[in-house]
Amino acid sequence: MWIQQLLGLSSMSIRWPGRPLGSHAWILIAMFQLAVDLPACEALGPGPEFWLLPRSPPRPPRLWSFRSGQPARVPAPVWSPRPPRVERIHGQMQMPRARRAHRPRDQAAALVPKAGLAKPPAAAKSSPSLASSSSSSSSAVAGGAPEQQALLRRGKRHLQGDGLSSFDSRGSRPTTETEFIAWGPTGDEEALESNTFPGVYGPTTVSILQTRKTTVAATTTTTTTATPMTLQTKGFTESLDPRRRIPGGVSTTEPSTSPSNNGEVTQPPRILGEASGLAVHQIITITVSLIMVIAALITTLVLKNCCAQSGNTRRNSHQRKTNQQEESCQNLTDFPSARVPSSLDIFTAYNETLQCSHECVRASVPVYTDETLHSTTGEYKSTFNGNRPSSSDRHLIPVAFVSEKWFEISC
């Protein structure tokens, strides 16, 4: 279309003298038209940009079919993996236009159902709906391939709806139900499962009564079997088996009181970091207390020894000084005529360092009588500072005599 416009513009171009305006104009228009048409052509391709374009709003569904007079079916959404339902118009099956009705793959699928889309073989055989669908499919084989395919799809949908009631848990096969995990029996340890939050979360042991219906050509036998199995849902479970019921408010980490089949009581799991004896801070506290008590006892004994030794030293020194004083007093007050005085002098009575290395030889001391002492003019001094004897027992010694005696003793 735009090429015709360009051709018309080129034919209608007016050639002015010196200015070919028509040629320039149609070149510019052609470039503009190409720039507009190229993105539209790219959007129609199967590239990744096609999915980013906004989709047109869907048309509202028809509420009434004008041909058959029956209410029209609501079309399936675009994102649904299930194929749209086939409408029956005037007793004939009408397939979608985009789908071929006579494919060799579809004909093979009509004769042999696909494995894995339905339930396990035991469940497929036991379902009454499958029996009806198989009978209808056998009648539809003679009718035609489109009707066979529609009936097979309908039978598969019935199987998906009746999956829970016809599931055989003894085979421990996984189910196709969302948020539902069925486990087979694993042993006697199922009742001792660890539960962090008792009564709210965690798997528990559940027994489900399942009814399995088996359809035979002549007779129909219904058997009810109780199969213990473990059911995990989103978080809220319930125990139905009275033998393995766990109370909701009691933690499962406690030791189980019910013995197992062997008669042995199963021990609960030990928590990591839990010690069987005292804690670390208790051991440290006891050790420090013992050390302090022992140190106090040692200090008391040392102080007692020191006090006893110092008391003995003081007592011994005082006794020695007393003995020295008594001895010096005795030496000064007792002057026999034929005896030489001892090594301790009057001036060394209270000094232990001044001792004579040998006995001093004294010359003959004149004998003084009481008259001579009283008649001698001078001062008299007592040399004893302790407990004085009576005046009759004391002997007064003149100072001149003491000084003379000091010079006469060679020490």
UniProtKB/Swiss-Prot annotation:
Subcellular location: Basolateral cell membrane; Apical cell membrane; Cell junction, Adherens junction
InterPro entries, alphabetized: AJAP1, AJAP1_PANP_C
PTM comment text: Thr-237 and Ser-239 may be phosphorylated; however as this position is probably extracellular, the in vivo relevance is not proven.
GO biological process annotation, one example: cell adhesion
Signal peptide bounds: 1-43
GO MF term set: beta-catenin binding; protein domain specific binding; protein-containing complex binding
Topology relative to the membrane: Single-pass type I membrane protein
Record's keyword terms, sorted: Cell adhesion, Cell junction, Cell membrane, Membrane, Phosphoprotein, Signal, Transmembrane, Transmembrane helix
Residue span of region Disordered: 89-108, 115-197, 239-268, 311-330
This protein's GO CC annotations: adherens junction; apical plasma membrane; basolateral plasma membrane; cell surface; cell-cell contact zone; cytoplasmic side of plasma membrane; plasma membrane
Record field: transmembrane: 283-303
Reported effect, Y380A: Predominantly localized to the apical membrane
Region (Targeting signals): 303-411
Tissue expression notes: Expressed in uterus and pancreas (at protein level).
Keyword Zinc attached: no
Cytoplasmic side: 304-411
UniProt biased composition (Polar residues): 166-178
One Pfam family this sequence matches: AJAP1_PANP_C
Compositional bias (Low complexity): 115-146, 247-263
Topology Extracellular: residue spans: 44-282
Function: Plays a role in cell adhesion and cell migration.
Subunit details: Forms a complex with CDH1 and CTNNB1; interacts directly with CTNNB1. Interacts with AP1M2. Interacts with isoform 2 of BSG/CD147.
Protein name: Adherens junction-associated protein 1
Gene behind the chain: AJAP1
